[in-house]
Amino acid sequence: LMTDQVWHDDPKRLLFLLSRYKFVAKMLSGKEDVLEIGCGDAFGSRIVHQEVKKLTVADFDPIFIDDIRSRMEKDWHYEAKVHDILCGPVGRKFDAIYSLDVLEHISKDSEAIYIENMLASLSDHGVLIIGTPSIQSQAYATPQSVEGHVNCKDHAELKELMQRYFHNVFLFSMNDEVVHTG
């Protein structure tokens, strides 16, 4: 659904999307039980699925989850569930959670709920990866993207937010499909 529109509007953006999923897959390789929050149509989720034992994808929109289930292949089976992370934790603990391109759509007033509900769904020694465009990137974003991005941050703001919840915070940047530490 979403990815088809991306292919129509800006095909090179698919490279950026898939690069993010490849990064997550490498970071979470070997994890037992992984959750994606805000999966949309789950187009890139299969890349992560190759590297982890069990994957669950969740989105608040049942249209996406119904579409994912209708396209599910036997050899690529994973759980797809309707869940709004702003309404509560998922209900069980995961080794790792990732959420790509979600935070920027959540109001600043709700960002603590978003993070706290993911934390409540994360095992004590679990890993959380959050991917979000920087405020600086908005100068290059499409008008449609900018319209929905209500909570973009710079590196310092994102790090400060994450340090409220985590002892260890590592920030990465991305230009086109290249991930780096700058």
Language model feature labels by segment:
Residues 1-98, 109-116, 151-157, 174-176:
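Conserved N-terminal segment of class I S-adenosyl-L-methionine
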Residues 130-150:
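Short, glycine-/aromatic-enriched active-site segment of Class I SAM-dependent methyltransferases
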Residues 28, 162-163:
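Hydrophobic C-terminal alpha-helix "anchor/cap" residues
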